[in-house]
Every structure is written in structure tokens, then in C-alpha cells.
């Protein structure tokens, strides 16, 4: 007698960005499982999965972000605890879905006696029991090698490019620094647009403080769009935008995958030459981070397709024409 087992897909989410997880579940036609997350009186996080996951493929969705009542460290810890709970409940395969991967900028030792925290986070996920990692637009490609297992590196480029097409014909895609030139070039090629680069000089010993310096490329009288993986305090983007205006750009917009928007970011963008900020919803955007210039596009369809491909054991890279390995 041949025994045929049916594959089971289960979706779970932490509390950092529940609306995104609910949108993904809706697109997949699946019900979002209950993780029953709570804190003890001393702040320790506890989870009890609400249904049987034995033998199932469990996808645990959590953006590593700060929201009311949760720090970025809490959001990572929630995901680790849910992974451990699923492993101990005999899940067949556990996939950590991290639309925004925390500590990604700490991907190397910039100076002596510094940690490589992006690698530490990857090790924690593996130790907790994750078999696979899914993320979007990692800050650097080498993070894919930090996790001891398959990593599906998705890109928000299809979503952002669709939005950027509405900016006009004579478009210049601009990299805000030399490190993002390769990404900006990919956008420029798909948009059939020209490419420009803004050189920047960081102020020594001042974290999150930058000074834009010069522009390479023809921007005079043209519409420019700055592209980066994330905008944190917006110092880089605003300084680059002012530099482009000084070099004759007719208008300047910005686009990013991850709108971190920490501290002074919102006020800086509001009071800058940036006309529109095009971004995705990899991170939650509470009321205090919403403003007229902000234009948010959902990343849920890309995540849903990737989750379906992983579950069905089909190609994820084909979703991006094989161009998601950078």
C-alpha cells in the first residue's frame, strides 16, 4: 500500500507588522495562524502556537522593526521564539520570512574590535531551528552567505519600477553614493534611463551625519530619482537631493525598499527638495511617519509568490528573471 501525504502550509506572524502578514495570507488564500504572543510581568516574551503544525511547512513572518511596545530586538526575539516553538512542535520545515532583516548594516568589521552582528542574527535563526531564510533587498549581498542554509533574496525592484515609470520620460536614476551604483544601474537599465552618482563624504566620528559633495552625470534640467535600499535618518538622501538641485535638476524624487525613517527623517524630507518618496511596506508606517510626500506600494504580492514557490519547491529566482542574486 502506497502512503500519500498531503503537504501542509502554515503561516504565522509576529506583532511587528501584522497587516503585511494578513495581506500575504489573503493573497495565498490561507488563514494566518495564532502565535499567541504575550509578555510576562518582567518583559519576557512567550508564545503558544494555536494549532497543530506537525509535519507542516511553517512560514514565520516578521519585519525587524520598532513599533509601539516593541523594539527591533523584541521583534527579532519574537521570531526566534516562534521558530523554536514550531521546531519543538515537530514542523517539517521552518522558513523565517524577514521582509526587513535587522542589523543588516553591521555586515563587516569597519574598525577593530567591532562585531559582525548581521552574521550573529543569521546564526541565531539557524540555532533556533530555521531551515530557510527569505528576505527583501538585503543591505549587502554577502548576508546571503551568513545563514547556514538556503536564502531567497527577493527584490522590490518590480514594484518600485512600476511606480517610477509615472515620473516621466526624461528620467535620470541617481545613486546617492558609490556603494549603490550597481543597484541604481539595474533600475536605470530597466527604465531605459540615464545614470548619475552623488559622491558623499561622511563626517568623521559622527554617526548618521553625511555631507554630499559632487555629482557625476548629466542632471541639468532633468527629473532625477534617488534610489537606495533603505532610508533611515534621511541625511544621505536629503543632502544628495540638494546637490542635484544645485546642479540644475528640474525635480528630485527618492525611492527605497525599506522606509526606516528614524528620528529627524520625516521632517528632513518634508523640508527638502524631494518631491515624492516612493517606498514599499516592508516596514510598518505609523501615523507619525505618514506625510504627503510619501507613496507606499505593497510588497505582499512578491512575498506571497515567493512563499508559494518555496512551498511548491519551484524556482524563486524565475520570479525575477534570475536577477535577484545581487
Model segments located where?
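PRPP-associated nucleotide enzymes
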Residues: 1-326
